[in-house]
Swiss-Prot record:
NCBIfam families: rplV_bact (TIGR01044). One of its GO terms (biological process) is translation. This is Large ribosomal subunit protein uL22. Part of the 50S ribosomal subunit. This protein binds specifically to 23S rRNA; its binding is stimulated by other ribosomal proteins, e.g. L4, L17, and L20. It is important during the early stages of 50S assembly. It makes multiple contacts with different domains of the 23S rRNA in the assembled 50S subunit and ribosome. It holds the Pfam family Ribosomal_L22. GO terms for molecular function: rRNA binding; structural constituent of ribosome. PROSITE patterns: RIBOSOMAL_L22. InterPro entries: Ribosomal_uL22 (IPR001063), Ribosomal_uL22_bac/chlpt-type (IPR005727), Ribosomal_uL22_bac/org-type (IPR047867), Ribosomal_uL22_CS (IPR018260), Ribosomal_uL22_sf (IPR036394). Keywords: Ribonucleoprotein, Ribosomal protein, RNA-binding, rRNA-binding. Belongs to the universal ribosomal protein uL22 family. One of its GO terms (cellular component) is cytosolic large ribosomal subunit.
Length: 115
């Protein structure tokens, strides 16, 4: 049986826009874990905080479940899927209303050992 060299973490229905979150994950894809955490710490967006939480969870999964070393890990795969959209309405002039879409995202981060 092959040895497991990667670990995954997912956050579902996170209240951040998928489009804005994709901009953040593009910054860390392929980087070493320590570098990725440093980048996310200094990225001043709500999406960066959420992605950092998922990344830390993936690192913990790698260490605790599979016995991988944190120093050898890289962010091998990250992707954002669109979650359910909450639809709301804002009252406007003359009895009309404008729609508001509160978007959510599913954030997935996979960390793997560097060969």
């Amino acid at each position: 049986m092959a040895e497991i060299t990667s670990a995954k973490a997912t956050a579902k229905t996170v209240r951040v826009s998928p489009r804005k979150t994709r901009l953040v994950i593009d910054l860390i894809r392929g980087k070493r874990v320590a570098d990725a955490i440093a980048i996310l710490k200094f990225t001043p967006t709500k999406a960066a905080v959420e992605v950092e939480n998922v990344l830390n969870s993936a690192i913990a999964n790698a260490e605790n479940n599979f016995g991988l070393e944190k120093a050898n890990l890289v962010v091998s795969e990250t992707f954002i899927n669109e979650g359910p959209t909450m639809k709301r309405f804002r009252p406007r002039a003359k009895g009309s209303a404008s729609p508001i879409n509160k978007r959510t995202a599913h954030i997935t981060v996979v960390v793997a050992e560097k060969e």
